[in-house]
Amino acid sequence: MFRLVNTSQGLRPALISKFKHAKTGGTNPSPFSTTTTNAPTNTTPTSNSKYESTFQFKRAQSTVAPPATVATTIQTPSSQNAAANPYRSKLDSFSRIYHVPNHVVGRRTEKIDHTATDEMATLILDENFRNQMTETDLYRYAASIYSAAIAVRRQRLEMSRNRDRDNAASFGDDLKYQSAAIALAESIAAGEFPQQVSARTLFKVFATLMQFKLNDEIMNLWETGVAQSEGEDLGDIGKMYLDHTVLSVVLEVAYDSKRFSYEEILRIYEMSLVENEPIHPYLLERIGQIAIKHGDHARGLDCLEQLMNNYENNPRARSILGALSQIHIAFIGNCKDTIIAKRFFEKAVDESDHLPYTILLKAPYVVSFLQNCNALGDSFENIVDMWSRVCQFYIKRREEQPSRMVTINSGLFKILFDKYPEPSMEAMKLMKLTFAKCKNINEHFLNTLISHMPWKDRTLVNDVVSAYDKFKVPKSVVSHRIILKNAGNVEYTPEEILTLWNQLLLKLDSEGYKYIANADWAAIRLATIFSEQFKSPERDCLYYSIVRTYKNYMQHDEAALRFLRATVRDATVYKQISRITTEENPTFEINYDIEVPEFKNLKENTNYPKVTKKVTDANPNLL
């Protein structure tokens, strides 16, 4: 496999020659440029979906042969044979998944039907099936994986689905599309789609891998693909990996993972340009982002200016609008020069209605912006003010997703408690300021505050917990878990911790839970046996007594097995917990008699001692 390494000799001459050779490749007219060309147009069929244009890239600077040229080498079955060919029939009836781009105003959460993509992921393992595929078939499959991965993540972050750690199916969609993307990337790298692969398909594959932060897989696939251009019988496959849309993903990953130096990134970028041909907005935006991260603000501003020029020529091109939005927030979150960053922040928060593109004020960029301001000496009062303005921006735009608010609240409280790990009059004053500046004191605000608060004083912690009642914020199951977890950092008595545990169980019961979930067991462990600040025999024995009392309330037999197996790593804990399996009613150094409330929904679901006996039998030396 070809490797580009950062050596004293710089880029390998072989790679440079590949880029120079690619610059002579055929091109197609671009939807974002007014440049005229005599090259053939992209003849890929379009969908009836109004979002199709988001994914169809008619590349002005393409380094690959036009899709129409590739298509002529594929023998598509005739209509008469298609009816008798079950593979062709399935390909023709494949229902592609779409997602709505972020910059589309009024976007709603997508409803995803995974059936067709699931079936395709299985069928594509069959060589005979792959041989029936066309370039369009492969692209539609890759685009479906990409869109589904985005939609599934949105559903999770927007809390349109209930994701319980004990429900294995809740992770299924994420793992399914991650596995599908990896499998498709491996098949492409292995040369299993020599006629079907195209630059637009590669872009979808790379972008999906990027969604899952699979940086090594991205670079390995790209380097393998570039190396393929050495083969005499592989046509333009190697050139496809030098397409601007593909490079827009690869170069960012290469920079972030330190695979290439900044200078090498610029050399690759400059060699990918073709005279008198436009640069794809995605590549312009990514090079701008990389420059901003590197502190090359002049180049970042140049990229923004070029994108604005493209916008003036084609103000409705979604690729340009999305690129403008992304490079704008990159200046906010990634620019270490806070004078520049604050100017873009002001534009986004106060003047967004006057911008030609929609600002997507992503929470991680906001947090990075606040951290940069803090690092360069901004007062906490000023940081709270900027945080409050962002919150108002989200409320005004109806973008108050729980995950987004938790992220920016976490960033704010981390700054506060890093400055004040111990309570003081000044710290208390600033914490009260966050309450005063918060326009919507809700569960997410209070949960995040308690999660990050390192203060151990029981009175101070109780004052914060009382804010749920003071501001009429109902405590959810998550709130009760967070309060219980935090008890591990507070000087509570075992009786007070038991009260918090009982409050959690009553909330579970009122919400219709039939079992005590793994997240609940994790919370009580952090409050007792895993307490770093106040670990004691009293807390340890309280935990053992709770497990003894509620051992059969776990979700099912498998949950009970996982519960005990997880304790094997700690010999002391395992020795005590295993007694609940091997002894009928064990007593501990300090015995707590725990009274079980009358539940309406919580119930015993397993015979814990019987189920977990296989674990203790397998590890007799640890008893």
From Swiss-Prot:
Phosphorylated. Phosphorylation promotes binding to RNA. Residues 1-60 form a transit peptide. It is found in: Mitochondrion inner membrane. Keywords: Membrane, Mitochondrion, Mitochondrion inner membrane, Phosphoprotein, Sporulation, Transit peptide. Residues 27-49 have a biased composition (Low complexity). Residues 20-49 are annotated as: Disordered. One of its GO terms (biological process) is sporulation resulting in formation of a cellular spore. It is a peripheral membrane protein. One of its GO terms (cellular component) is mitochondrial inner membrane. Binds the 3'-UTR of mitochondrial mRNAs. Involved in the processing or stability of mitochondrial mRNAs. Monomer. Belongs to the RMD9 family. This is RNA-binding protein RMD9, mitochondrial. It comes from Lodderomyces elongisporus (strain ATCC 11503 / CBS 2605 / JCM 1781 / NBRC 1676 / NRRL YB-4239) (Yeast).
